[in-house]
């Protein structure tokens, strides 16, 4: 009986060590996600301006900043996130938009606007054409290594 209990304890210690060792800090963090969303969003705004026939602006002129938080299950890792994006519109006024994100374990995400702040999935260009709203839903990936 003593030998069996000792073996069982040893097995439990090994299993616990393996499980804990495999559960290191996730590479998916708020900072990494924010650093991925900011340039992606800025580049999409720059392209959107062109599609709408508005005066061109460089992506860096939009001064995009993001603030992200995981909605469930801790502060890091794959799953559902929310990000607030602040950026300078063409008039120089600060605009704020909220996005719901789903982030996968490989660092890829899909961002969908909360509400219709940015005009819905289709916008009217200056010449009357319908154009896809690139800011309504967008995807991106970041390095998790």
What is each stretch, according to the model?
Residues 1-21:
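Sec-dependent bacterial lipoprotein signal peptides
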Residues 1-4, 28, 52:
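Short, aromatic- and cysteine-enriched interfacial helices/patches
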Residues 7-10, 33, 59-64:
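A broad structural signal for short, well-ordered beta-strand segments within beta-sheet-rich domains
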Residues 23-26:
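Bacterial signal peptide processing site
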Residues 32-49:
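Post-signal peptide N-terminal segment of mature Sec-exported envelope proteins
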Residues 44-75:
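Post-signal-peptide N-terminal segment of Sec-exported extracytoplasmic proteins
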Residues 77-145:
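Extracytosolic low-complexity repeat regions of secreted or lipid-anchored proteins
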């Amino acid at each position: 009986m003593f030998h069996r209990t000792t073996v069982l304890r040893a097995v439990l210690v090994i299993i616990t060590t393996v499980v804990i060792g495999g559960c290191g800090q996730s590479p998916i963090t708020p900072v990494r996600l924010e650093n991925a969303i900011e340039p992606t969003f800025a580049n999409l705004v720059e392209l959107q301006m062109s599609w709408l026939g508005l005066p061109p602006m460089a992506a860096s002129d939009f001064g995009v900043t993001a603030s992200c938080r995981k909605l469930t299950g801790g502060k890091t890792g794959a799953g559902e996130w929310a990000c607030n994006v602040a950026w300078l519109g063409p008039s120089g006024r600060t605009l704020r938009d909220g996005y719901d994100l789903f982030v996968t374990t490989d660092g890829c995400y899909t961002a969908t606007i909360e509400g219709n702040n940015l005009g819905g999935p289709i916008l009217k260009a200056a010449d009357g054409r319908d154009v896809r709203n690139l800011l309504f839903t967008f995807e991106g990936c970041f390095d998790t290594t």
